[in-house]
Amino acid sequence: MEEEFKVTPWEVEGIIDYNKLIEQFGTSPLTDDLLERTARLTKSELPIFFRRKFFFSHRDYDKVLDDYEQGKGFFLYTGRGPSGPMHIGHIIPFFATKWLQEKFDVNLYIQITDDEKFLFKENLTFEDTKYWAYQNILDIIAVGFDPDKTFIFQNSEFTKIYEMAIPIAKKINFSMAKAVFGFTEQSKIGMIFFPAIQAAPTFFEKKRCLIPAAIDQDPYWRLQRDFAESLGYYKTAALHSKFFPPLTGLEGKMSASKPETAIYLTDNPEEAGKKIWKFALTGGQPTLKEQREKGGNPEKCVVFKWLEIFFEPDDKKLMERYYACKNGELLCGECKRYLIQRVQEFLKEHQEKRKKAEKLVEKFKYTGKLAQEQWNKAIPDPLKK
């Protein structure tokens, strides 16, 4: 009997069958042809997120590439709900987004939904979500986005978004929102209005919007695709990633609410190493003798999966490690030590950049070229109706 899995914007459980998920969500596979076309148009080698199919599904990405080829361009939009510290799983889609911004030379809008997290999380105050907004913004800036082509905006500050959301809210009836978000009679009225605010950035430019995000976030954009053309805009496009697995196994995704499953971006590198050593599940045999005789199972190993997704950029080295494990030449302890070294190097570098990001917050939010344009721009005519 096949194991069941569950993927919603709020829950991810079980071993995910990504091919089945494409069918369930009605998305399209990110094919080799599309990836080859991306490499050709950008004149670049694809990053590991695309080469190794961590991004595996899309909506209208082919049309995004058509628009780019025809000189129409496109823009990027992504975001973060600031409910606590960010971990490695949160930041990976931002690195993919940075590559897209850099190679296609396009604008990027990053929405920080401090209002949403206050409304949806009973245990958080508005002050909490504003605090985490600032902390999360530092991690996002540390990724290395172009400050003149990136606008990071916090919903509680960028109140113009409310003015844009009102005509959008007029396009979404309660049954549409309920079908996506599962609202009930107990749902707060602020929660019911929020989908309109989340859709607003897809109308920041009169071009097609591309959203790189994990597949569980896809339902948020289905609503926009239902009404965008009636406002004279494009249906938003999306690139979907798989989930970054928790330390404890390949089921579900890394969760900030379960500290033993996650490496936070602000973790002390030494403590992060201890956490990996203690909790990271491997695909090894019960004994050293059996490991040498039978070999390991990298397909079931979190350590190998982390290297594959993010921490081993060299394809040749990754495959050498894969076969050394399968042949019993590589022991789990050796692999863990290697991953610990790579994670610690990443954390040290990220935390240095995070410290420097403190001086860049104002530029990304207020004084950068794109930020100023957005603060000064009038509401688009179709959204005034």
Curated annotation (Swiss-Prot):
Location in or out of the cell: Cytoplasm
Catalytic activity field: tRNA(Trp) + L-tryptophan + ATP = L-tryptophyl-tRNA(Trp) + AMP + diphosphate + H(+)
Record flagged with keyword Cytoplasm: yes
Motif 'KMSKS' region: chain residues: 253-257
Nucleotide-binding recorded as keyword: yes
One GO MF term attached to the UniProt entry: ATP binding
EC code(s) of this entry: 6.1.1.2
Gene3D superfamilies: HUPs, Tyrosyl-Transfer RNA Synthetase
Annotated keywords: Aminoacyl-tRNA synthetase, ATP-binding, Cytoplasm, Ligase, Nucleotide-binding, Protein biosynthesis
Annotated GO CC locations: cytoplasm
InterPro entries: aa-tRNA-synth_I_CS, aa-tRNA-synth_Ic, Rossmann-like_a/b/a_fold, Trp-tRNA-ligase, Tryptophan-tRNA-ligase_arc
A single GO BP: tryptophanyl-tRNA aminoacylation
Motif stretch ('HIGH' region): 82-90
HAMAP family tied to this protein: Trp_tRNA_synth_A
Protein's name according to its UniProt entry: Tryptophan--tRNA ligase
Species this chain originates from: Pyrococcus furiosus (strain ATCC 43587 / DSM 3638 / JCM 8422 / Vc1)
